[in-house]
Amino acid sequence: DKVRAGDAVNFSIGQGDTVLTPLKLTQMYAAIANGGTIWQMMIAKAIVKTDGTVVKTFTPKRLGTVKTAPSNLAFLRGSLREVVTTGTAAGAFAGFPVEISGKTGTAEVFGRNPDGSAKDDTSWFASYAPTKNPRYAVVMMVGQGGFGASTSGVGVRRIYESLFGVTGGKVVPGAALFPEGKPPTKLPKISPATKPKEASK
């Protein structure tokens, strides 16, 4: 099959035959945020027994780098910040006290629902924060969720509110999911498991 000019246009905006998972997009945004390094995705830091013994630790694996000039990355990062300040995500993040960078996405869906109605768009929002010293990359996709800003953008804001402890447009000390809104660098302390009581005779 030949790729037509229209297909190339679709690819450039993430539609048509473009297939991407939220996890993969998160990996891409993390690379943009950290200056271009692509890291292997991980869901665990270590395996720890109930008595606190560390069985195995997992070291982050560097997969490569984004092949582009630093000036291109700088331009992209500046553009992602403007999306949240003056662009399509400005409303979703209005008054947010932590600088967020990201991009809304609204992907058209072909077909109809069982009731005959047209399927709604797929809502996306991909981001990282804080803008100047990134700690998190957060991506949300909602099938038939409508516009990226009004559904996924609002949802991602709620996630950042928990991560940074934001209430009423202010960062509340002690309210963040992790202390000071920073992901932990050390393993948590695990107390020995409670021994089960013997059954009464």
Task: Tell me what each language-model feature is.
Residues 1-64, 71, 77-170, 201:
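Active-site beta-strand/loop architecture of penicillin-binding DD-peptidases
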